[in-house]
Design a protein with these regions (language model features):
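N-terminal nucleophile
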Residues: 2, 8-231
């Protein structure tokens, strides 16, 4: 468990999981008032979908096991039911899922601090707890649906809007972005601590899209081009 600072050592988070209907790519973004949100929350595989495991006592095993269930053919709802199972601590946890077919599911335990909840739509799920109010999730969802640019840019716009809408009641300390696709290398960006983590994440994303790093990316193997290399 990470140190949640002044709120009883609770990790509270808002996150978004989404599918790009044009490219088939999956992406997620998250921010929290504690450390290392990327390592705790976001997991994904372009073949199976995404998970976001968060809450007062987040279970990384839930996120990992849900992906395995979706790999085996479970829908998001089936995977959710299976991993929650008989976990006696489930009321302290929150888990959002997005499967390969764009189906979504979310569990929000009742012992997570208000405001807590989720909004679900085909190919999109936003969730959070210890938020300023429901307007945070509405900003996440609505901004993603109206934003322009590629999947990463839309996700960054969404968490920026969520922060402006009130975000996490403690203020934010870390932020992360994950995009997985059969046609591109994974994009995994994390700001594990910053006074302005979303701004820092946006800067890191800009750096990843330019210069020597961006020039190197087309040489890396992908699911659809596994033998790619340097000419």
């Amino acid at each position: 468990m990470i140190n949640g600072q002044d709120k009883g050592n609770k990790q509270m988070t808002f996150s978004i999981l989404a599918q790009d209907l044009n490219t088939g790519a999956f992406g997620g973004a998250a921010a929290t008032g504690s450390l290392c949100v990327g390592g705790w929350v976001l997991r994904g595989d372009s073949r199976f979908g995404l998970s976001a495991s968060q809450g007062a006592a987040p279970s990384t095993m839930w996120g990992e096991d849900a992906l395995l269930r979706m790999q085996a053919g479970d829908s998001a709802e089936q995977a959710l039911a299976a991993v929650i199972g008989q976990d006696a601590g489930r009321d302290w946890r929150q888990l959002a899922l997005l499967d390969r077919a764009g189906r979504t599911a979310c569990h929000t335990g009742t012992k997570n601090t208000e405001w807590r909840g989720a909004l679900l739509a085909p190919g999109l799920v936003v969730s959070g707890n210890l938020l300023a109010g429901p307007q945070v999730l509405k900003a996440l969802r609505d901004t993603f649906l109206t934003a322009t640019g590629d999947l990463a840019e839309r996700l960054l716009a969404s968490i920026t809007a969520a922060e402006a809408a009130g975000g996490d009641t403690r203020g934010l300390q870390s932020a992360a972005l994950l995009v997985v696709s059969d046609d591109a290398p994974p994009l995994t960006l994390r700001v594990d601590w910053s006074e302005n983590p979303i701004s820092a994440l946006r800067d890191l994303h800009s750096r990843s899209q330019s210069g020597a790093y961006a020039a190197w990316l087309p040489t890396v193997p992908t699911r659809n081009d596994p033998e790619r290399g340097h000419d």
